[in-house]
Swiss-Prot record:
Residues 7-190 form the YrdC-like domain. Signal peptide: none annotated. Its EC number is 2.7.7.87. It is found in: Cytoplasm. Required for the formation of a threonylcarbamoyl group on adenosine at position 37 (t(6)A37) in tRNAs that read codons beginning with adenine. Catalyzes the conversion of L-threonine, HCO(3)(-)/CO(2) and ATP to give threonylcarbamoyl-AMP (TC-AMP) as the acyladenylate intermediate, with the release of diphosphate. This is Threonylcarbamoyl-AMP synthase. It comes from the Bacteria. It holds the Pfam family Sua5_yciO_yrdC. The keyword Transmembrane helix does not apply. SUPFAM superfamilies: YrdC/RibB (SSF55821). It comes from Salmonella typhi. The gene is tsaC. Its main location: cytoplasm.
Length: 190
């Protein structure tokens, strides 16, 4: 069975997400695996697939800042901090924001914060807009293996039946930079 999802098949992808499935899709540098951030079942599947502990927390990727607002608390950001974030978005920089108590622990892990990104990858923008909200996004690779950069690499690691949105990555060599939205501290070099 071929579960490649052509770029124009957003209805099929949305259906998979609504059914709490995990999908793979291209991002700025590597393929990501993602799911509905509001579904504990879907996130649990993603964590099991990645062999990733829930306490590490996850990243949300979105088409717009508006899609991220239900999951983060940006009220304490100064004008300068806000400008620093928005100068990088949309783009391949992930920021860690304070998270309100309503943000599920399956997203934040052991933290009171959440890593989020407004992407400029056109396919992911279209996917998040079609779904109407952000996606959980973590690199598409099994524990101990390098992140996938092609559909073929996703198939090799996750199997032929794993649903993959066809498309090219954005060509960046490194995964997204991660910074603290409040302090600007660099957590991961991009």
């Amino acid at each position: 069975m071929n579960n490649n999802l052509p770029t124009g098949s957003s209805a099929a992808v949305v259906d998979l997400l609504n059914k709490e499935n995990v999908i793979a899709y291209p991002t700025e540098a590597v393929f990501g695996v993602g799911c509905d951030p509001d579904s504990e079942t879907a996130v649990t599947r993603l964590l099991a697939l990645k062999q990733r502990p829930v306490d590490k927390g996850l990243i949300l990727i979105a088409a717009s800042f508006e899609q991220l607002k239900p999951y983060i608390d940006d009220s304490i950001l100064t004008a300068a901090q806000r400008k620093a974030v928005f100068d990088c978005w949309p783009g391949p920089v992930t920021f860690v924001f304070p998270a309100p108590a309503t943000t599920p622990r399956w997203l934040t892990g052991r933290f009171d914060s959440l890593a989020v990104r407004v992407t400029n990858h056109p396919l992911v923008v279209a996917l998040c807009n079609a779904y109407g909200k952000p996606l959980v996004s973590t690199s598409a690779n099994l524990s101990g293996l390098p992140p996938c950069r092609t559909v073929e690499e996703v198939r090799a690691q996750f199997g032929d039946d794993f649903p993959v949105v066809e498309g090219a990555t954005g060509g960046r060599l490194n995964p997204s930079e991660i910074r603290d939205a409040l302090t600007g501290e660099l957590f991961r070099q991009g």
